[in-house]
Amino acid sequence: MRLEKRRVILFVAITFLLSWGLAAYPWFGGMTQDSLNQPAALLLGGYMWMPALASLLTRLLTCQGFSGLGLRPHIRGKGKYYWWGWSLPVGFSLAGVAVYFALFPGRFALNLQFPQLEGSTLLAMLLAGGMVLVVPVNVFTGVIGEELGWRGYLFPQLCKLTTPGWAAVISGIIWGVWHTPLICMGWDYGLDYPGYPWAGVAVLTLCCVAMSAWTGWLTCRAGCIWPATLFHSGINVLYSIFLLEGNFCGQAYCPLLGAHPLTLIGGWLLLVSGGWILLKSAHLFAGR
């Protein structure tokens, strides 16, 4: 038990040291997401890979070995978890869009102009096309680096120390706080919102806990990290589509209360369902 705790602490320390070390130059240099120079952009390009590197270094330094990385896919009898990992982000996003624009119908606007398509049709095409075309690419451009660390190492290590539900909560909090330098530089929510940047860190951390519930469950049930990687990648891709289109809003809005799935309104179904998984974790993670 003592060794397992040391491994968790060492992994978290290495992850934050490496990641925040890469972010230090642009972060303390006063740069933002929109004003990065080339060296800063190159440094931040490695940020998402640091959890994977930390997991490998922790295994090496504690003589843990490299089995159980979670990379071997298990398809037979587990295919539904891959489908869930792929499709759930779309469901969460559509539910968020529906509720957000039901609450604020006057805000809906599309900046892209396709006269032959209605706005709702174009939105559906953007969401579906992003999932089909971009998710497979996004998996290998940073998401796999995160998942090798968070679900491939931290989550199963925490499961040795506590229940899967609490492991999901703890790893989700760590995952959310890990994004702090990026949030301070304007990722996800920009720079102009009440409580910047700590309100942004808090909202993203809450969303990360909900995502951690889903990705932890997918990892437990599938026996590998790939369904969780698809889920994580899907959320990233859909969030990016929303930011490119200004949350599909033609009026000013609070970024923490936007339409994309990493906000308090757009992410309502992610948050509610993630909370439900945590409440039922004793049964769900065991497959009952």
Label the predicted regions.
Residues L60, P194-G200, F231-R288:
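C-terminal membrane module of polytopic membrane proteins
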Residues M1-A13:
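N-terminal membrane topogenic signal
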Residues I183-Y196:
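Membrane-interface interhelical connector segments
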Residues G21-F66, G79-V90, R107, N111-V134, ...:
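Alpha-helical transmembrane segments in multi-pass membrane proteins
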Residues I144-V177, G216, C220-C224:
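Membrane-interface helix/loop boundary segments of multi-pass membrane proteins
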Residues A13-F16, W49, W86, V90, ...:
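Residue-level signature of the transmembrane alpha-helical core
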Residues A24-Q33, G186-Y189, E245-G250:
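Juxtamembrane "helix-exit" motif on the non-cytosolic side of transmembrane helices
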Residues F16-A24, V90-A98, I173-L182, S233-E245:
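Aromatic-anchored segments of alpha-helical transmembrane domains
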